[in-house]
């Protein structure tokens, strides 16, 4: 008999309250790992199909058994859902999309970042440095765009190998679709201006570009440069006839769309963002309220606080008027150094954006309230299992991660009765211990976290979970005793038989062991917190280890001091960009000659290092 989904997530109930509109759905595991992103022509029907009957294959069964929650984003059409799905898959890399989807990638328009940039169709990994515009739903749209770009701005399309070896202009120049930079038929400043205009067009700023061209045409006419004025007139005519404002092609201007939904003293603010003409998807926030705040007050406070830390676009759409609009506009404009407009009475396409955001805010809030109810039940079960008199308001969990003692990192995650409090997560880079000594690492992390709490009279957890057995728990006990910390309930979470989930042993500070079993809501809560601490520790460890290894590679290269190392990293935007560069690109960095570039390239790719004479070392 096939096994159905084993998580506590009620997929049928979730699907039943969804809209029949098109959209994108996201499946998450208990530790917030993104499992899958999919699109739907009708969300209720598509999501419900996963939970009606037996999964079609073992991989789908495995995926569904891990689902702890789902999020959805409503769109206006299935085409929009398709594009948003692709963007989320590319940016978030869900675990199961790699195998469950066709790996064919959508096409983009690529504008390279070179002295003489080229424009071309691109599929696959973004290995080439430059800007990528899209995605497009098909190759036809890209080719039409490229044809227009060559006609309007005369940018080159040839590969570098062809560009570097030409002695006379190609056919593209002869038919007026390239300005001939390969043989110096266009000045560098003029070509750069064409690139700037092309970028504006691809960013969806065709109105602004049209105004610029109109002004240039008038100036040329006044200067009696009639031939140039005629060229600009033709350019403006072609631009206006080919302007495309289709939502699915990402031609929307840069803007944010905000909607606020409230229910049962809870609030959800949903942010829908567009940047460079691309729909970046939605993000949900759940601000804490006093239960009496109105939706417009909540939204107004959110706008002020959120954009104090994030650069605002020029236009922000709101689903309602907020208090002190003019004051907030002035403050945002001053901070951003450009005009910021807050709008709520809008029509046409922008009204559609507001409707999308409003529907998604309402749906997200309903989902959150359902999730919070389950979380409260698990928290209450934990209180009962531990025999605590008061509700469990705060739980912290520590975990250690390293690779054979290298780059040891400790994590501390925080949960309250409503779930994770990610803003209070902490990582500790462990040092000064014997590599691989988990006991010493745990003690150092506990001491650092609670010493600060003691010195600053900070908040303490009701329950402190330690990922480990009696030895780890003893280190935590000793550290708290040395600091004089009391009234914190300590629990060690030891792995069960064969490390199977649901078989964990809970070790109390007095030595007692509890084995509540897989069906226990209290253990499920502990597993959720422990798994989140594990994920957070591993992520920090991997980042620290990678940084140490890559940085040491640069430090080991003769001729690379701190200044050159900083120049290289700044030029390529980090180690990943540097590793993707070729020798010729590396040699363009100030202070790096061809020989040094060759040594850098060889070192980063594990090749034999050339010596000073240009010969490879053994």
Curated annotation (Swiss-Prot):
Domain GIY-YIG: 20-98
GO biological process: nucleotide-excision repair; SOS response
InterPro entries: GIY-YIG_endonuc, GIY-YIG_endonuc_sf, GIY-YIG_UvrC_Cho, Hlx-hairpin-Hlx_DNA-bd_motif, RuvA_2-like, UVR_dom, UVR_dom_sf, UvrABC_protein_C
Location(s), subcellular: Cytoplasm
Signal sequence segment: none
Domain of life: Bacteria
Keywords linked to the UniProt accession: Cytoplasm, DNA damage, DNA excision, DNA repair, Excision nuclease, SOS response
UniProt-listed SUPFAM superfamilies: C-terminal UvrC-binding domain of UvrB, GIY-YIG endonuclease, RuvA domain 2-like
CDD domains listed in its UniProt record: GIY-YIG_UvrC_Cho
GO cellular component terms listed in the entry, alphabetical order: cytoplasm; excinuclease repair complex
Family: Belongs to the UvrC family.
HAMAP family given in the database record: UvrC
Subunit structure: Interacts with UvrB in an incision complex.
Protein name: UvrABC system protein C
Gene: uvrC
């Amino acid at each position: 008999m096939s096994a159905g989904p084993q998580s506590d997530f009620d997929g049928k109930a979730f699907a039943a309250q969804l809209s029949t509109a098109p959209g994108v759905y996201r499946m998450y595991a208990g530790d917030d790992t993104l499992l899958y992103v999919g699109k739907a022509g009708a969300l209720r029907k598509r999501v419900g199909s996963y939970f009606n009957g037996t999964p079609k294959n073992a991989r789908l069964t495995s995926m569904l058994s891990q689902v702890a929650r789902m999020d959805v984003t409503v769109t206006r059409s299935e085409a929009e859902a398709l594009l948003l799905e692709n963007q989320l898959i590319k940016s978030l890399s869900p675990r199961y999309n790699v195998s469950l989807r066709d790996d064919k990638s959508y096409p983009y328009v690529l504008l390279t970042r070179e002295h003489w940039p080229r424009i071309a169709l691109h599929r696959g990994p973004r290995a080439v440095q430059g800007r990528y515009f899209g995605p497009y739903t098909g190759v036809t749209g890209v080719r039409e765009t490229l044809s227009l770009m060559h006609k309007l701005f005369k940018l080159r399309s040839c590969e570098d190998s062809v560009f570097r070896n030409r002695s006379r202009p190609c056919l593209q120049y002869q038919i007026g679709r390239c300005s001939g930079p390969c043989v110096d038929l266009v000045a560098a400043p003029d070509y750069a201006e064409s690139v700037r205009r092309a970028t504006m067009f691809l960013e969806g700023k065709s109105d602004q570009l049209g105004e610029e061209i109109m002004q240039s045409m008038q100036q040329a006419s006044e200067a009696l440069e009639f031939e140039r004025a005629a060229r600009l007139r033709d350019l403006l005519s072609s631009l206006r006839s080919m302007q495309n404002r289709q939502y699915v092609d990402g031609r929307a201007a840069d803007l944010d769309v905000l909607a606020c939904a409230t229910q049962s003293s809870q609030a959800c603010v949903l942010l829908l963002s567009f940047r460079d003409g691309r729909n970046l998807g939605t993000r949900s926030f759940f601000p804490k309220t006093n239960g009496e705040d109105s939706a417009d007050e909540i939204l107004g406070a959110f706008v002020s606080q959120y954009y104090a830390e994030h650069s605002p676009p020029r236009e922000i759409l709101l689903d309602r008027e907020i208090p002190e609009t003019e004051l907030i506009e002035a403050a945002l404009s001053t901070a951003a150094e450009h005009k910021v407009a807050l709008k709520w009475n809008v029509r046409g396409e922008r009204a559609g954006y507001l409707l999308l955001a409003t529907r998604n805010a309402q749906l997200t809030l309903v989902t959150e309230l359902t999730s919070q109810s389950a979380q409260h039940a698990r928290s209450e079960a934990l209180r009962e299992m531990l025999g605590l008199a008061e509700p469990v308001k705060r739980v912290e969990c520590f975990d250690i991660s390293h690779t054979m003692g290298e780059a040891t990192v400790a994590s501390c995650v925080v949960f309250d009765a409503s779930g994770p409090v990610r803003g209070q997560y902490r990582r500790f880079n462990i040092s000064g211990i014997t590599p691989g000594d988990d006991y010493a690492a745990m003690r150092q992390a506990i001491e650092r976290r609670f010493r600060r709490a003691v010195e600053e009279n900070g908040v303490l957890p009701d329950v402190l979970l330690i990922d480990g057995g009696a030895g780890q728990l003893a280190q935590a006990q000793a550290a708290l005793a040395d600091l004089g910390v009391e009234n914190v309930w300590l629990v060690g979470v030891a792995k069960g038989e064969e490390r199977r989930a649901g078989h964990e042993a809970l070790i109390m500070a007095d030595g007692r062991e509890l084995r509540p079993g897989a069906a226990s809501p209290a253990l499920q809560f502990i597993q959720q917190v422990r798994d989140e601490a594990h994920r957070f520790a591993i992520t920090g460890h991997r980042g620290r280890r990678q940084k140490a290894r890559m940085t040491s590679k640069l430090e080991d290269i003769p001729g690379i001091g701190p200044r050159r190392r900083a120049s290289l990293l700044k030029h390529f935007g980090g180690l990943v960009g540097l590793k993707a560069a070729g020798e010729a690109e590396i040699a363009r960095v100030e202070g790096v000659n061809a020989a040094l570039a060759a040594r850098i390239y060889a070192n980063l790719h594990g090749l034999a290092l050339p010596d000073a004479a240009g010969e490879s070392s053994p």
